[in-house]
Design a protein with these regions (language model features):
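Active-site loop-to-helix junction immediately N-terminal to the catalytic Tyr of the SDR YXXXK motif
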Residues: 1, 47-55, 67, 95
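Active-site helix of classical SDR
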Residues: 21, 57, 65
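Residue(s) in the substrate-gating loop at a strand-loop-helix junction
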Residues: 41
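Short, small/polar-rich loop/turn modules that mediate ligand/substrate recognition or access, typified
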Residues: 73, 78, 144-146
Length: 159
């Protein structure tokens, strides 16, 4: 674990949420309401071996979401978080490659192991996350706040 990796990950994954929210809240209050959607991860629910800074930053986003939902509800501002599971694409491919290297296994085996941790046995697509976000900002979700919504095919563990 390198200090530089820790600082960079916290800056990107956690501080960016703080700064965005700090500047968005006055606009939402002026507008008499709205919706904030934070992006966390299932790593923020389970932890994630070999990705400590990432998991810590995503746990913190859940805390921010819960706290802000309590603070901003009186202003008709809803705050929720989406926790995607493993998302198909370059990023998960890099994670699979790194884990395969660290344990001396093939990438195919590691990918199969990752998929085995998910009840639906598949990774999430970006569109799945977008669909949840669309729902959370809609009028149909007008009474949903302070919730941590997983879009993960039912990830049961991360190891």
């Amino acid at each position: 674990l390198k200090i530089e990796d820790w600082k960079e990950t916290i800056d990107i994954n956690l501080n960016s949420h703080f700064y965005f929210t700090k500047f968005a809240i006055p606009l939402l209050k002026k507008n008499k309401g709205g919706s904030i959607i934070n992006l966390s991860s299932t790593a923020g629910l389970f932890g994630f071996p070999l990705r400590t800074p990432y998991a810590a930053s995503k746990w913190a986003i859940i805390g921010i979401t819960k706290s802000l939902a309590m603070e901003l509800g009186e202003f008709n501002i809803r705050v929720n978080a989406i926790c995607p599971g493993s998302v198909s694409g370059d990023r998960i491919n890099r994670v699979i490659e790194a884990k395969a290297k660290s344990i001396g296994s093939s990438e195919k085996e590691v990918k199969e192991d990752f998929e085995a941790m998910v009840s639906l046995k598949t990774f999430v697509d970006k569109e799945d996350i977008a669909n949840m976000a669309s729902f959370l900002i809609s009028n149909e979700a007008s009474k949903i706040s302070g919730q941590i919504m997983t879009v993960d095919g039912n990830t049961e563990r991360m190891d």
